[in-house]
Amino acid sequence: MAQYKGAASEAGRAMQLMKKREKQREQLEQMKLKIAEENVVKANINKKFSAHYDAVEAELKSSTVGLVTLNDMKAKQEALVKEREKQLAKKEQFKDLQLMLEKQRERERKKEQKRKIASLSFNLEEDEECEDEEGEEEESDKEDPPEEKKKKKKKKLGKNPDVDTSFLPDRDREEEENRLREELRQEWEHKQEKIKSEEIEITFSYWDGSGHRRTVKMKKGNSIQQFLQKALESLRKDFSELRSAGVEQLMYIKEDLIIPHHHSFYDFIVTKARGKSGPLFNFDVHEDVRLLSDATVEKDESHAGKVVLRSWYEKNKHIFPASRWEPYDPEKKWDKYTIR
C-alpha cells in the first residue's frame, strides 16, 4: 500500500502556486484599471463638446456673411446635428461600460473576500491515488519502450476545482462581454430613434411687439431650423413682412434664451435642459411655471416659445422683453427662475 510522501515539498509547491496566481491576479487587475482609466480619459473629452456651441454658432454666423446659399447653410447645420448625436451616443455607451466595470469590480471584491476566508484545500485521497499510479508506472516503465515513457512524464497534476480562476484571462468571457456591449449599444440606438420619431405639438407665438399664437406638429428629432421653416410657411399668409423672409432671418426664443438653429428638440428632451423662466424640454403651454407659494420650485410647465425676425430683435433688444433674452449656453445652470 502506498504511503503519503513529501508533505513539506507539496506544501511548498502549493504556496508557490498561490503566490504565482496572486501575482497574475494583481497584474490582471492593474490592466483592467488601466483600460478603465483610458476610457474615462476618452469620455472626459466627450464632455467638452458642449462648450463648443458658442464657437459653432460663431462659425455659422461668419459663414453666412455675404451671399451664401441656403442649401450650403443647411448642409453645415445638418453636419453639426449629426456630430451632436454621435457624441450623445458615445456618452451613453461610456455610462453603460462604466456600470459594467463597477459590477465586475464588486464581484471580484466579494470573491477575494471568500478566498481570504477559505484556505486552499487539497484532496488527500486524490494525492494517494496519484502516488499509487506513480508506483505502478515506475514498475511498468522498466518494461515500456522510451516513447511510452516520454508520454507518461508529460502527465501533470489535475486542477483543483475549488480554486477560483475567474481573475484569469478567459476568451469566452471576453467575447460574451463584447456581445453584451454590442447588444446594449444597438438597443440604445433603437430606443433613441424611436424617441426621435415621436410626434409632438409645438405651441409658439410670432412676436412683433405683440403675440400671435400658433401651433405646429413636429417630430422630436427635428431641428429648430426645420421647425422655423414650417412656422414660417404658416405665418406668411398673415404677415406681409414675412413673405420675403428666409428661415435664417428668424430667431426662436424659449424661456428667455435664444436657441441656435442646429439644436433639435431631442437634445433638450434627453438632457432635461432648463431656461431662465422654465424647462426647455416641454413645448405645450401653461400660464405660469412658478408656484405662487415658492418661486424656486419647478413644475413641468412652460411658456410658448417666441418666433421673431432678427431685424426686429436688433431694433428692440434694449426694450422688455427682448432685453431679458440671451444666447443659450448648455454649460450654464438656472437653479431658480426670476422675473425682472
Curated annotation (Swiss-Prot):
Biased composition, class Basic and acidic residues, residue ranges: 169-178
Pfam families linked to this entry: XAP5 (PF04921)
Cellular location(s): Nucleus
Biased composition (Acidic residues): 124-146
Entry GO CC: nucleus
GO process annotations (BP): chromatin organization; mRNA processing; RNA splicing
UniProt entry keywords in alphabetical sequence: mRNA processing, mRNA splicing, Nucleus
Region (Disordered): 1-22, 123-178
Keyword Nucleotide-binding: no
Main location, first listed in the record: nucleus
Keyword Protein biosynthesis: no
Function description: Probably involved in the regulation of pre-mRNA splicing.
Annotated protein name in UniProt: Protein FAM50A-A
